[in-house]
Amino acid sequence: MEKLWLNSMFSNGKLEHKYRLSRSMDSLGPIRYSSGSEDPVLNAMDNKVSSWNDSGSCNFSNVEHFLDIIDIWSFISDDTFLVRDSNGDSFSIYFDIENQIFEIDNDSTFINELESSFSSYLDSSSMNSGSKKSSRYYYRYMYDTQSSWNNHINSCIDSYLRYEISIDSYISGETHNYSDNYVYNFICNESISGNESRNSAIRTSVNGSDFNIRGRSNDLDINKKYRHLWVQCENCYGLNYKQFFRSRLNICEHCGYHLKMSSSERIELLIDPGTWDPLDENMVSTDPIEFHSEEEPYRDRIDSYQKKTGLTEAVQTGIGELNGIPIAIGVMDFQFMGGSMGSVVGEKITRLIEYATNKSLPVIIVCASGGARMQEGSLSLMQMAKISSALYNYQLNKKLFYVAILTSPTTGGVTASFGMLGDIIIAEPNAYIAFAGKRVIEQTLNKTVPDGSQAAEYLFQKGLFDLIVPRNLLKGVLGELFQLHGFFPLT
């Protein structure tokens, strides 16, 4: 059962009634009360909206006695948008800012039939009244040119965003041409403001991706005031509703780009619930070389990242079960000082490998790092050799199974050591994987690095790793790999 929420207000004399329309794929059921006074005329079971059939027609004859031409715009709430993307698909978008609700219904059949029914009702009501323009609620843009209608749409949406949500800055583009806007309908019951803003351009198709709200080219970040509601894709700049973003595994719903995940989110993704047992979680750095910066002392910087992320270091290690198979896993977190590898990170990963060696467990290390931590000097570089030595004993002497998962970004010392030592090396789609960054190479060698030459897809063709696996398939793929190598569930 799919539901389209239209928190609309119907006027009938002095009474107001709030409704919820519940819709299945085949029919639109009776209109039911959610609040308001009982009205026997509206509550009668015979006052139903008939089924939506293949012909696309709908009979409103049973309810026309309480709907007037002035009320048809109240059928859709002020917070509901009807839009069409560049492919011609129709969507309804519902906002409830107060309750932080954002819902999208993309069943084009329902929207098209709804639009058709409303248009038919408007035509019939206008004929009964004798003139379309006799009503003061008649929208002058309804039968105007497409250009004027598009301008009106942009004006309404711009006014809604700026006044209803109180956005301080414009969501704007640099053009006054709205001919490429795919927003085709916006139904509201407020009077049209005389001030039409021509500085906003809200597009539902940018570079082949639908429902992107494009801001100024020099300001791609979302307004800080609403970052608790939205996550902006760093690839297509589309907005993802935060409430659903985590359930989608931090994958952009517009372009499929894999955005960064925290180490805790990755543990939740890979480890069976209730089986996670962390190792060495209280190990912290003691500033071994007493590194001090004019901007911020190293210890103070460590403390600030600990408060920001809730982690003690840039890696979490522990044991758990993946589809019932006991494993040892280390997950690096780029949010903690760029996932840089210091003495504590190296020690925790080494201890994890040694524990797995003694317990004969398969090992997974999820890499997300900018490389060695410069604040610890040569001690951070030593971790590369220390981890590689532990892996040598684990893989060659004990003949156990190690899987390296490379996420974006994986660079520097991590790439040069345990990141590329896996028996199976898996990369995420679009992951940035390199030893030296693009700018470092260009400034050092004075040569241009081609775009995409450090992306997972290009490196896969060059044989740098074995698989590119999307997040939603990763756990299943790992489970099959472990069983193929002789590791089976406990039960």
Swiss-Prot record:
Cofactor section: Zn(2+)
Domain CoA carboxyltransferase N-terminal: from-to ranges: 229-491
PROSITE patterns for the chain: COA_CT_NTER
A biological process term (GO) from this entry: malonyl-CoA biosynthetic process
Subcellular location: Plastid, Chloroplast stroma
GO MF terms held by the record: acetyl-CoA carboxylase activity; ATP binding; carboxyl- or carbamoyltransferase activity; zinc ion binding
Pathway recorded for this protein: Lipid metabolism; malonyl-CoA biosynthesis; malonyl-CoA from acetyl-CoA: step 1/1
Lineage: superkingdom: Eukaryota
Family per record: Belongs to the AccD/PCCB family.
Record-linked PANTHER family: ACETYL-COENZYME A CARBOXYLASE CARBOXYL TRANSFERASE SUBUNIT BETA, CHLOROPLASTIC (PTHR42995:SF5)
Official protein name in the record: Acetyl-coenzyme A carboxylase carboxyl transferase subunit beta, chloroplastic
Lineage, uppermost ranks: Eukaryota, Viridiplantae, Streptophyta, Embryophyta, Tracheophyta
The encoding gene: accD
